[in-house]
Amino acid sequence: MVIREAVASESRPAATEAKAMFSWIRPISRGWRICSAENLIVAAAFLLAATPATSPSHAQAPATPIRIDASRPAQEPDLAQYDEGSATAPNGDTLGLNSRYLMRNGKPWLPVMGEIHFSRVPRERWEEEILKMKAAGVDIVSTYVFWIHHEEVEGHFDWNGQRDLRAFAQLCARHGMMLQVRIGPWDHGEVRNGGLPDWVLKQGPTRVNDPIYLASVHIWYAQIAAQLKGLLWKDGGPVIGVQLENEYSKRGPGAGEAHILELKRIAVACGFDVPFYIVTGWDNASVPPRAVLPVYGGYPDAPWDSSITKLPPDEVYAFRSQSRVTAGAAEDSTRLAPDTKTPTAEQLPFLTAELGGGIEDTYHRRPVIAPDDIAATVPVMLGSGVNLYGTYMFQGGTNPDGALSTLQESQDTGYPNDLPIKSYDFQAPLGEFGEERAALRKLKVFQYFLNDFGAELAPMTVSVPEMQPRNPADFSVARASVRSSGNYGFIFCNNYVRGYVMPARPAAQFLIRLPHGELAVPRHPIDLPSGAYFIWPFNFNADGITLRYSTAQLFARVADSGINTLYFEAVRGIPVEFAFDATTVRTLKASSGETLRDSGTMIVSGFQPGVESSIDALSAQGNQVRIVVLTAHEAENAWKVRLGGSDHLLITDQDLVADRDAQPGQIWLRSRGAPRFAFTLTPPIASPLKANLPLALSSTTSGTSSFSAEAPSWSVPLEYHQIQTAGTAPPVKLGPAFDWRPNRVAQAPGPGDLPQAAEWEITVPEGSLTGLSELFLQIDYQGDVARLTANHRLLDDDFYNGKPWLVGIRRFLAPQGPSTFELSILPLREDAPVYFELGELAHFGSSGQIDKVDDIRLIPEYQLEITPGESLGRKTD
């Protein structure tokens, strides 16, 4: 019964279509579902009234304008219904908030937050991974502190090695990264018992105001506080907030808001005096008024779902105009809380902590996340009013070894899903071994936009189109919104849904009613391609020049020699057009396209994007402004860096590590597989560069400097051979049922099943790392579960999902001599009740099972180190 997805736009039976109508009721929490009767009644009534007979609709969209009324007068935000802790640092810097947005030093602030779990990453890699996150535009690092990782045995605390929270926080401080600490006591994070040690469960009731439980929590919180002493915001440190509990919606005596308040009281008593105390806000969460801030999220898939078929369209691709919890929901979870004093959405800013940067593979559901699956959610969430963009996970990891047990979530421990024992890759933008994925590059474009223009976006309010989708499965209506302040703002649009083909929208045009009249964007209707998503500015003040609109996405600002350069990204499939208020422009010259005047507007149409193409203008006040429109490929590969005291965009296909605030600047480029490097700097660099490899200046223009380098080619033989053939895989067992998921799901094989695995021995020669930053072992296989061991110690594991398994082995190589690994692959049974999104499995044959290795190879990762130096490089012809 192995289920394989074949075609994204397949036709589906009526029962499946009906399921699509109700798909958005599915909550976003990773593995838990708590739906109140009120939620279900409201949802059912809404859908019966609004849902079409067949859904999703794949019909060609009609040629209709997208009308949005954003004419209401801008209103000042109210005071937030929240009492923050100490919010002033010793240097006078302050953090705060009002009812609409966060503030830094009294000014609007829209930060980017990314999740990494320090205890799942080797200590020696922390600094590099923090720098990667920073280079990609992350402002705040978020991390769980898993109780079971630090006190697996009662009274024996481990804060050493990769469990050293204090050292991790100090690294964040060193690199100017703020830190949000999620202190539990229950965390989830796909960890055993949600992070609670086994001995805590044996004490009695948990997650309620039980005296024995709270006494243990007090000791736990005090331990964390001791680790972070002197590192809080008020001390000049990076810790700006703590999260209490997670996905908490218990009600009853000693539970609910009373429990959250007690946890906060204990945290404060232990020394946690921070600006922001947060709780997750979904699943009818407990949000005591004024004490905590709710944060929200959403994921591109639901591997905790019991279905082993393709899921309906996910709500995360539809704008949340009525709720912060889910698109189309009638009520926000905070409004459903029994305490009528609970703050409403209008009294607190829309903050997020768990917008999926990927998703885990569970044993029974193995989704494969594409880069657009992640990036397309960004304009949706920002266009829904989000004013803290928090990604879970931003960096994957590996579960540490436990002293008493393995540390992953499993059905054997009463939890709903089976996860790999070691791997927590999460298909994140930064993988388990630090590899930079395409999703990182796409996310980075939006994160740079928030870095440079978030302060302008934060105060803006949301306006929605006159016509909106009736539910997330309704594809017949364009998905869009506007955030604006007066006549100035941004258009947000998404025409992408994971796993489905959205219709192209011919003759699309945004007609925005503003306080001073209507604005048409663009001036003539265009065809909106299937799969497009973007953020476009309108009436944007470009250093004195009013940009009426652009059909390219603004994403970065770089100042160079008194000239502000604005960088835009061309949206694939949409012609680039700029319209300027002619009264604000003295002169304008475009390197391509046609420039014309129309009713007081200066229009550049047919502009050809590329790093060498620009629009150079002089404002009526005499300010020089340059606009550069990069192709989508160039923008996704552009990094903001600082070299020799000046800011640049560095465009490269290679991975990048850099501290963009460091002086004079140092950059590491990484190339996986090929020894060649190439990069372009814009604006061009005036100071010299040096590198660890011969660096050639391949070209220079008025707008760019381009360089290339090549490392000595690496070649090391890899030896592997099969040492055991597979036995007969046992029938797949089903795990327990749950109230919220009555259908039982497949359970991962246990230790008793391992003797049936096929085995291979892999030998990596001594010295294989010479000249490399990392060495990856790529295993192309088909099977059920794969494990990599050395001397019978499990190093990493994988649930097969149709993609090659990539393992960074630098951390596993022997210090001397060759390194030997054992690869075991448990056969996949043809009748396994498991969902595979990708991968055409080979013929199972008469055995009814498959365990197959197509190839095992080593992939070198080369490194180019760049710093300001003595020469610009060797000029090439």
Q: Where are the language model's segments positioned?
A:
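Aromatic-lined substrate-binding rim segments of carbohydrate-active enzymes
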Residues: W126-R192, K264, V268
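Bacterial N-terminal signal peptides
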Residues: E38-P52
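Active-site region of glycoside hydrolase catalytic domains
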Residues: R174-G328, R335-D361, V380-V386
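Carbohydrate-binding surfaces of carbohydrate-active enzymes
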Residues: K202, Y213-L228, D235-Q243, G256, ...
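Short, surface-exposed beta-strand/strand-loop-strand elements in extracellular ectodomains
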Residues: A508-I512, D581-A582, G783-L795
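Aromatic-lined ligand-binding clefts that engage carbohydrates, nucleic acids, or primary amines
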Residues: S768-N791, D798, L823-S824
